[in-house]
Amino acid sequence: MSALPKSELDRYSPMVEADLSEVVAIEADIYPFPWTRGNFLDSVRAGYSVWVLRDRTGVLIAYSVMTLMIDEAHLLNLSVARHCQREGLGWRTLEWMAEVARGYGARTMLLEVRPSNVSAVRMYERYGFEKIGVRRGYYPAHTEREDAIVMRVAL
């Protein structure tokens, strides 16, 4: 399967409560320690910048969650359905989130990522994110907690 054509990328829309069953199903499929329905619901209700991407048939294939504070965006979650990974949708969703952040006046974007998520780390580095720190024991893991790499990019 090839990446969606650019015309299909116009299907980003704000995440709403009706999307949560699909979002949580993808989250549970791709992560050993997924966000809960409550995490996503709290993000929607708190007014975070939360987005979903649907393909031309209406199937939810990617989503993202970001907070915006004055001139800084904090990307909390960017995920692509397993069957659509490695097609450029993570990159395109990152570009979308950066565009949204710039529209709100953000000059920088921060995120945390697991060191074990090598493909995500590489994507963020290609985009221009730089490693600026480590949060010790940030993520749950099977035996011990996993650190988070803190990254930042100028928008």
For each feature predicted by the language model, list its residue ranges.
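Conserved SAM-binding loop
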Residues: Y12, E112-V113
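Conserved active-site tyrosine of GNAT-family acetyltransferases
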Residues: Y124, F129, M151
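Conserved short alpha-helix immediately C-terminal to the canonical SAM/SAH-binding motif I
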Residues: T93, N117-A120
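Aromatic-flanked redox-active Cys/Sec active sites in thiol-based oxidoreductases
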Residues: V80, V113-R114
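Acetyl-CoA-dependent GNAT
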Residues: A3-E87, W91-V100, Y104, G137, ...
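A secondary-structure capping/hinge motif
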Residues: K131-G133
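C-terminal "cap" of GNAT-fold acetyltransferases
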Residues: K6-S7, R107, R114-V118, G137-L155
